[in-house]
A protein has these predicted regions:
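Intrinsically disordered, low-complexity proline/glycine-rich segments
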Residues: 1-214
């Protein structure tokens, strides 16, 4: 399944997205934040399933998971039954001067990891794994028009596509959302030398999207 997540609005402390499947709207994402804080209330409505996300980092910026691993920027995830889990960023110190960052999501007993690589001419790629098997890829363009962000999800089925919509909302809030700024007429192209981390590069399969049907 292929889903397109297109930002439609960016106000001072809020943002809105449409979720499209075959050019038809199948859901929305709404973000409500506040000045000077990464805390936000997020609602993902996709195929009629409503998932809410709230900042759950508490007073401490980081939490130690195990030796060499720390988690940051934790958000809770809840559905209509108040059942859900958490999503957060993990920093793994492989060596003294090598730290690898990725996203981890626990949802209803399932564990997802999302690994990012930057491609110099194409933008970002998030390779999404569940229990060690790749189930999706999220493409993030290297060009941003009018401060509005777009994401494309390539997933093996609808369930995994819905989970990736949650991951996209999280990526937006921690990487792209800037409270206090409105969308303005602009064009930005990001340039990067590309990812060098061997661990992250191993997770990226450039042929994965060719296996996905719309």
């Amino acid at each position: 399944m292929i889903l397109k997540i297109q930002q439609t609005k960016k106000e001072l402390f809020s943002a809105a997205f449409d979720i499209l499947h075959k050019e038809e709207r199948v859901g929305t994402i709404s973000v409500k934040g506040k000045l000077g804080s990464m805390e936000a209330d997020i609602c993902v409505n996709v195929f009629g399933n409503i998932i809410t996300m709230k900042y759950a980092g508490g007073l401490f910026a980081e939490q130690k998971i195990k030796k060499g691993y720390k988690s940051y920027r934790k958000y809770s995830i809840s559905d209509a039954t108040n059942d859900g889990g958490y999503i957060y960023q993990v920093d793994w110190q492989q060596k003294l001067f090598l730290t690898t960052s990725y996203y981890e999501m626990e949802y209803k007993g399932m564990y997802y990891n999302s690994y990012s690589v930057a491609l110099p001419a194409e933008g970002g790629r998030q390779s999404v794994y569940r229990e060690g098997v790749q189930v999706a890829q999220i493409n993030i363009p290297g060009e941003v028009v009018n401060n509005l962000y777009n994401y494309t999800i390539y997933a093996i089925d609808q369930k995994e596509a819905e989970m990736c919509a949650v991951i996209c909302a999280y990526i937006y809030i921690i990487a792209h959302f800037k409270p206090g700024e409105k969308a303005i007429k602009s064009y930005v192209k990001y340039y990067t030398i590309g990812t060098k981390d061997a661990f992250l590069l191993e997770k990226y399969n450039p042929d994965f999207v060719e296996t996905i049907e719309e």
